[in-house]
């Protein structure tokens, strides 16, 4: 995450480690430079930020000057706020193009998405409270980790509140972290209890 005066920016990544590290390293170098061509400080809005990050990603994964080497590709999610503008969240693809959240789909995912997506599709709405949205994200991670052993902790949880221009909460959760362990158990127990209340088939009465 990056927070300075008039802006707070959070960047997530998945994909090729070399490309992701190159992007993060170049972003830091541009921030430290006295006269950068572009940096997170000079971008006027999140479209410019997404284009800047996309350009860096494309530079690293573009091995022949024309096409992106998919083995070197990384995806990024960038979110946050610039003073005087609304909060933003965007997904940046390896070729440098990007999309933003919408009313129809007010969330974005990186990495292994299929196991945790159903809960997000069912529950995430724009009117959801920040706390409920965070719990939903953790349940999504929990579902993914139960179905795919290649996905595991730590889970880095970052909370940004609109117009604060700083990270209000930052946690790193493990399986045995009391809060996460309690959340995981209650979600599993709740699903089992709810499953027992589902309607019966007519033919079950014959058994």
Where do the PLM segments sit?
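N-terminal nucleophile
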Residues: 1-207
